[in-house]
Design a protein with these regions (language model features):
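Ribonuclease/tRNase effector modules and their secretory precursors
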Residues: 1-96
Length: 96
């Protein structure tokens, strides 16, 4: 079962982390407890706490063409639109 972050934003209602995003999140924000469920819960919490903007944080600026970003503290998630209205995919996890 895939976890989905639900947020209150005019364009983005749900964020689904890609497999690559989950792997990068595990590398960039180690979770002290064991188990995939603990990591998934921490990632969903970070996405639900994120501010969605068209502008990346200054430290994440690069040549990536991304329409929207979800930024949660020291983490940034570039978002790609999915086929479902209001649902976006977090393609990776970047950290400062």
């Amino acid at each position: 079962m895939q976890r989905v972050a639900r947020i209150d934003h005019p364009e983005v209602h749900e964020i689904v982390p890609s497999h690559h995003c989950v792997l990068r999140f595990r590398q960039r924000r180690p979770v002290r407890e064991r188990g995939a469920d603990v990591v998934a819960e921490a990632l969903i919490a970070a996405l639900e706490d994120a501010d969605v903007s068209r502008w990346p944080p200054a430290w994440a600026v690069g040549d990536r063409n991304t329409e929207l970003w979800a930024v949660s503290g020291e983490l940034a998630f570039p978002l790609e639109r999915s086929a479902r209205h209001g649902r976006y995919v977090a393609v990776t996890c970047l950290s400062r």
